[in-house]
């Protein structure tokens, strides 16, 4: 179920959700009447109204929703949402900004940092390893990275083996320490 105070937003959400209601998510009685406590998961995606976001999250915690995700727009906002009881706080604008910034240099196509010490990076094969098999390229020993999969030409991503031939233009997904993955993606 989706809940929003804005009629236009509610109308647009009907394409994605089976049941959408125009209501005030910051009113505990309304949330009870709508049966919010019957749901296993709630997502608070209130945009710029920090007070409404915190209040809606608090109400869902009070209704004992087992899993609550909440969107934060600042670090302080995120800290408050955690203290109020959100189980997971996400920063979509910040995270997407970081992700896009990583694709602006080198050969990085996509970047996903899972924590400060581990990232998945989609990148093209550098000239230094093109024409070699995964075993002879020694990416793990030289760069400390694991090659998760490869996409050759217009084909799908496939798991690699030591015999996988790395060709210029192929796309790799590598996993490892972010700094090392960025260095690998910056090779010529």
Question: Can you describe what each PLM-predicted range is?
Answer:
Residues 1-188:
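Cytosolic regulatory regions of ion transport systems
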């Amino acid at each position: 179920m989706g809940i929003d105070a804005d009629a236009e937003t509610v109308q647009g959400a009907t394409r994605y959700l089976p049941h959408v209601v125009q209501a005030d998510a910051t009113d505990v009685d309304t949330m009870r009447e709508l049966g919010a406590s019957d749901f296993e998961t709630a997502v608070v995606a209130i945009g710029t109204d920090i007070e409404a976001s915190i209040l809606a999250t608090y109400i869902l915690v009070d209704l004992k929703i087992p899993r609550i995700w909440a969107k934060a727009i600042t670090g302080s906002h995120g800290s408050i949402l955690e203290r109020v009881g959100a189980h997971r706080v996400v920063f979509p604008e910040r995270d997407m900004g970081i992700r896009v910034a990583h694709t602006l240099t080198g050969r990085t196509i996509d970047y996903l940092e899972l924590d400060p010490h581990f990232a998945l990076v989609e990148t093209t094969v550098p000239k230094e390893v093109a024409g070699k098999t995964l075993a002879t390229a020694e990416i793990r020993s030289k760069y400390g990275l694991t090659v998760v999969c490869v996409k050759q030409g217009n084909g799908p991503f496939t798991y690699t083996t030591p015999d996988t031939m790395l060709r210029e233009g192929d796309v790799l997904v590598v996993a490892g320490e972010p700094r090392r993955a960025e260095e690998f993606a910056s090779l010529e």
